[in-house]
């Protein structure tokens, strides 16, 4: 009879430990998971990631910077109107800078269309623009007479070449890997939320019932009453 309270204590301890284990299982908060999923989905609905927007801004900067240098070159070589007519209307591959400006326009249109409008997740568009830019500039530097026209004969081809390769590096090493990493994180969070949904809901303290402890003498009294019942019936 003296071992009964110890058994009751062991039972209570077991129930408390099971309760603690259930709480540990529900340490994953589905609300937090859903909040993270909504944040990732909000980025998708936003249409364009922050790093891709930065890339598009740099492409725009490429066009504006080359345009600015070309306008400066037009103004330096005898006025904008006269030089513009000479380079555009009387275009000469060997001495004109107009084709370098058109090359910047070509990069801008292709890259913005591919990575801002179509939201392409492949490198083929940037590979096309960089290859065309590199081949054209190398041919122009070798065949043309730009170096005899002052500093702009060096500046415009070099700047265009560098900007094209910076765009390639930025897309290939920043934009595409970061977006792929964010997509993998979204898949992991969604998978964790699905697993958390399969776990049964946590049990509250009120759902655990612990029977009241009985005194040692109460069972002895019950046994005496059971033994006296046949005598009373006789």
Curated annotation (Swiss-Prot):
Residues 48-218 form the MENTAL domain. Tethering protein that creates contact site between the endoplasmic reticulum and late endosomes: localizes to late endosome membranes and contacts the endoplasmic reticulum via interaction with VAPA and VAPB. The modification Phosphoserine is found at residues 15, 21, 27, 193. GO terms for molecular function: cholesterol binding; protein homodimerization activity. PANTHER family: STARD3 N-TERMINAL-LIKE PROTEIN, STEROIDOGENIC ACUTE REGULATORY PROTEIN-LIKE. It is a multi-pass membrane protein. InterPro entries: MENTAL, STARD3. This is STARD3 N-terminal-like protein. It is found in: Late endosome membrane. Residues 1-53, 119-122, 172-234 are cytoplasmic. The chain crosses the membrane at residues 54-74, 98-118, 123-143, 151-171. Belongs to the STARD3 family. The FFAT motif mediates interaction with VAPA, VAPB and MOSPD2. Pfam families: MENTAL. Residues 200-234 are annotated as: Disordered. Signal peptide: none annotated. PROSITE patterns: MENTAL. Residues 224-234 have a biased composition (Basic and acidic residues). One of its GO terms (biological process) is cholesterol transport. It comes from Homo sapiens. One of its GO terms (cellular component) is endosome. It comes from the Eukaryota. Keywords: Acetylation, Endosome, Membrane, Phosphoprotein, Transmembrane, Transmembrane helix. Residues 75-97, 144-150 are extracellular. The modification N-acetylmethionine is found at residue 1. The keyword Membrane applies. Homodimer. Interacts (via the MENTAL domain) with STARD3NL. Interacts (via FFAT motif) with VAPA. Interacts (via FFAT motif) with VAPB. Interacts (via FFAT motif) with MOSPD2 (via MSP domain).
């Amino acid at each position: 009879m003296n071992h009964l309270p110890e058994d009751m204590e062991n039972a209570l301890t077991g129930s408390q430990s099971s309760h603690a284990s259930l709480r540990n299982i529900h340490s994953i908060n589905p609300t937090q998971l859903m909040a993270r999923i909504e944040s990732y989905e909000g980025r998708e609905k936003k249409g364009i990631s922050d790093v891709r927007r930065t890339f598009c801004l740099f492409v725009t900067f490429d066009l504006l910077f080359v345009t600015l240098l070309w306008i400066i070159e037009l103004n330096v070589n005898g006025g904008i109107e006269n030089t513009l007519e000479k380079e555009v209307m009387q275009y000469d591959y060997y001495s004109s800078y107009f084709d370098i400006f058109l090359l910047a326009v070509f990069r801008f249109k292709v890259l913005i269309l591919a990575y801002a409008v179509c939201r392409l997740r492949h490198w083929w568009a940037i590979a096309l623009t960089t290859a065309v830019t590199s081949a054209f500039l190398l041919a122009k530097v070798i065949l043309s007479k730009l170096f005899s026209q002052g500093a702009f004969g060096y500046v415009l081809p070099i700047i265009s070449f560098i900007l094209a390769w910076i765009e390639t590096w930025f897309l290939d090493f920043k934009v595409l890997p970061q977006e792929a990493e964010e997509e993998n994180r979204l898949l992991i969070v969604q998978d964790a939320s699905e697993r958390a949904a399969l776990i049964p809901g946590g049990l509250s303290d009120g759902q655990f019932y612990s029977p009241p402890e009985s005194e040692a003498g109460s069972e002895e009294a019950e046994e005496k009453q059971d033994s006296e019942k046949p005598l009373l019936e006789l």
